[in-house]
Design a protein with these regions (language model features):
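A short, compositionally biased domain-edge/stem linker segment
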Residues: 9, 33-36, 251
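Cleaved targeting-peptide boundary
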Residues: 20-27
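Bacterial N-terminal signal peptides
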Residues: 2-12
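Low-complexity, repeat-rich tail regions
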Residues: 20, 69-268
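General zinc-binding finger modules coordinated by cysteine/histidine
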Residues: 46, 50-71, 83-84
């Protein structure tokens, strides 16, 4: 019964209001570090990069590959979600769309999301213009580009994937960033399906890939016709192991394994 409830909470895909961007289930262990990976080329004009992240599902933490998507509205930016430490557990703050980039925990997701704001491109009228110093763009296909190498210095190279708590990023939102969340729009149905599909593939589980997922990024979101390669379903053993780490807020549960691994590079 508990496993079914957890699955329903994480894999249902309603359209939440801004007040629902906070996931209510706490996890007693921290997510792994953000892996280092290569961004696939932008497939077409006006596609925006949504960086990969660690989500939680019935099988535990799993990697949601970074991917290119269209914004639900021209002029909107993506603010990534993040894990935050509160009430003796880690809680997920969902990402959202909006006219500005808000607070995403100070997490360095790479590719222009270096902890604050976004420097990988900007909207000029109805066209998104890409900063080729950061973003992987084929300029024979996409012509709205510029190059600003000065923003590369904003990359702090820290790959910790959660805010607050022991070993976490100690950033706090500005009043401007907090206001941005209030104007936020939920992830698209395409994004939700992408996340849900990744969570059903055992190869994406942190307990299986040990923080180094085989598929870190894809050009297009997972869909009914674009399934994960080498797909393997999550097992009942995976679900049972994950349930041990679902915390009850305020229960006094303490964080476990919440120090990021040293040397966040794939094994040679």
């Amino acid at each position: 019964m508990r496993a079914a409830l957890i699955a329903a909470l994480f894999f249902a895909v309603p359209t939440p209001s801004p007040a629902q961007f906070y996931a209510g289930i706490g996890i007693s262990i921290a997510p792994p570090a953000i892996p280092i990976y290569t961004q696939p080329p932008c497939p077409a004009p006006n596609y925006l990069w949504t960086p990969g992240y660690w989500a939680w599902g019935p099988g535990g933490y799993y990697w949601v590959p970074g991917t290119w998507v269209l914004a639900p509205t021209l002029g909107y930016f993506w603010t990534p979600g993040y894990w935050g430490w509160s009430s003796n557990a880690y809680f997920w703050h969902r990402g959202y769309w909006g006219p500005t980039v808000g607070f995403y925990g100070g997490i360095n997701y790479g590719f222009g999301y270096f902890g604050t704001g976004f420097v990988g491109g900007r909207w000029i009228g109805r066209n998104f213009t890409y900063n080729t110093a950061i973003t992987n763009v084929n300029r024979t296909v996409i012509h709205n580009t510029y190059r600003d190498v000065t923003v590369i210095n904003q990359n702090n190279h820290v790959r910790t994937s959660y805010n607050g708590g022991r070993g976490g990023i100690q950033a706090r939102p500005t009043s401007y960033e907090a206001a941005s969340r209030n104007q936020g729009r939920a992830p698209t149905t395409e994004q939700k399906y992408h996340e849900q599909t990744a969570g059903t593939d055992r190869n994406h589980l942190a307990t299986v890939n040990h923080g180094y997922p085989r598929t870190t990024a894809v050009s297009h979101p997972y869909s009914a016709t674009n399934r994960p390669p080498h797909y393997t379903p999550v097992t009942s053993s995976d679900r049972q192991a994950a349930q041990q780490h679902v915390a009850v807020p305020g229960s006094g549960s303490r964080p476990q394994g919440n120090r990021p691994p040293q040397g966040n590079h794939p094994p040679q």
